[in-house]
Amino acid sequence: IIRMEIKRAMRGFKDVTPTEAVQLINKQDAIMLDVRESNELSQGSIRDSKHLALSVLKQRVDELKTHAEKPIIAYCKTGNRSSAACEILKKNNFTNVMSLKGGIEGWKTANLPMVK
């Protein structure tokens, strides 16, 4: 358990719950970054989120530079790809990046609003 916590701390980003994400959106104008593939978007997404699939994020990361000062919360279906997205963002000098714990599934479980 301690080893997992050390590894998590060394990543340079943290996981946030859906409730924490809502607070960051409301108080700090956080950007929700949907890193799912296009064919997954029909399942719904978080309002006003920016879509950049993980498969193209490295090539298109500059599109996020205008948001570099804001918190960026990456999400996917369950939270695995969003961690990889956070690593890419950190390597490109984004400093305030987070991963949505549980992904869009966690968001749904928390009964938070979505758009189709």
Where are these regions (language model features)?
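Conserved beta/loop motifs at nucleotide-recognition and modification sites
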Residues: L33
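Rhodanese-like catalytic fold shared by cysteine-dependent sulfurtransferases
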Residues: I1-A30, S38-P71, K77-K116
